[in-house]
């Protein structure tokens, strides 16, 4: 009947319309290009901008492109932080710090920088998806983070935003469980700088992530040194082993007050499998008074290496774990994973 025919035509038009819209959206996204970099897939979003999987058009090298969001690009302080993140990270060459490839601005005023692409999980994702991380693997990963921080601290650079989301557990160069320290957007020289970088953060302002910030950051102290990063490392280790941060509240102010004034619940009360020796290391990192913490990252790293853990993590165990669990972004590295695990 005519009514049936009209219904069929309507369905056909709707189907074609949806297909056309979908095609146009895909083509619009595929057309996104920044200089020599073609954006392929959105990987995530942060406080300042969005991160995309991209490819260099000439070299065909996969990379990650971070683009500052338009609403943030109008804020001079955000632009300063974005630029500082690029410059601070570009000073670092350690294997466990993320590599920066490029930095630029498009004709329409979009700021971006290009970094190495990391297939894997950040520490927050690891804990969320698989639960607390065993002591052996925690030591294995944090030993690498300590190495990256030694280089940063050695040139007077304090990270100031160490947290699970900024520590990536990656597959790089045929190696599994490579720890990468990310996001130096809050980094600040611990000594006076002639180029003015030290003035990019307002004196007395609160910087960092409340769940993992040091007491001196929580109270807005101007003089923050590498021992502040050591506190944050201790807070991250606490989280890795217990599945929860040292202090929790829906109110960030309460969390900061707790960091500054309250005793932390000993991690062994949360996870009895933690050894007394490991707990001692964590609690020393989390001392309120910076003078009572490890005084440098090298000292913390030595303590971690001297720790006698029941389940030492090895490269072989890392391959086994990754072959069983893969990545949260399932499409990232399936072929590479199967090949490497079979070797």
Stretches found by the model and what they are:
Residues 69-91:
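AlphaC helix of the eukaryotic protein kinase fold
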Residues 149-150, 168, 209-341:
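C-terminal lobe helix-coil module of Hanks-type protein kinase domains
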Residues 146-157:
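Protein kinase catalytic-loop region centered on the HRD/HxD motif
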Residues 170-215, 219-223, 250:
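Activation segment of protein kinases
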Residues 141-142:
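Activation segment signature within eukaryotic-like protein kinase domains
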Residues 108-122:
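Conserved short submotifs of the Hanks-type protein kinase catalytic core
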Residues 122-133:
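AlphaC helix of the protein kinase catalytic domain
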Residues 102-104:
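A short, aromatic-enriched beta-strand patch in the conserved N-lobe beta-sheet
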């Amino acid at each position: 009947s005519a009514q049936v025919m009209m219904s069929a035509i309507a369905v056909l038009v709707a189907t074609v319309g949806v297909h056309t819209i979908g095609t146009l959206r895909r083509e619009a996204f595929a057309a996104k290009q920044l200089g020599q970099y073609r954006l392929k897939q959105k990987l995530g979003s942060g406080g300042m901008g969005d991160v995309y999987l991209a490819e260099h058009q000439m070299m065909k090298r996969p990379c990650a492109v971070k683009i500052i969001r338009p609403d943030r690009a109008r804020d001079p302080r955000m632009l300063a932080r974005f630029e500082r993140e690029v410059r601070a990270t570009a000073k670092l060459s350690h294997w466990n710090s993320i590599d920066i490839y490029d930095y630029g601005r498009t004709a329409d005023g979009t700021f971006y920088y290009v970094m190495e692409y990391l297939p894997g999980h950040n520490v927050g994702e690891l804990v969320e998806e698989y639960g607390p991380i065993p002591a052996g693997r925690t030591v294995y990963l944090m030993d690498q983070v300590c190495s990256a921080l030694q280089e940063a601290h050695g040139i007077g650079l304090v990270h100031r935003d160490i947290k699970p989301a900024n520590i990536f557990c990656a597959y790089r160069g045929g190696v599994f469980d490579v720890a990468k320290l990310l996001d130096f957007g809050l980094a600040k020289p611990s000594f006076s700088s002639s180029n003015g970088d030290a003035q990019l953060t307002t004196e007395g302002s609160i910087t960092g992530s409340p769940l993992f910030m040091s007491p001196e950051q929580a109270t807005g102290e101007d003089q923050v040194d590498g021992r502040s990063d050591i506190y944050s490392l201790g807070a991250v280790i606490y989280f890795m082993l217990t599945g929860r941060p040292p202090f929790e509240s829906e109110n960030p102010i309460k969390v900061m007050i707790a960091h500054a004034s309250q005793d932390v619940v000993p991690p062994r009360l949360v996870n009895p499998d933690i050894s007394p020796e490991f707990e001692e290391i964590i609690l020393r990192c989390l001392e309120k008074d910076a003078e009572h913490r490890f005084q440098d990252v090298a000292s913390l790293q030595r303590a971690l290496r001297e720790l006698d853990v029941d389940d030492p993590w090895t490269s072989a165990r890392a391959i086994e774990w990754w072959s069983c669990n893969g990545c949260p972004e399932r499409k990232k590295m399936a072929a590479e994973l199967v090949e490497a695990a079979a070797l």
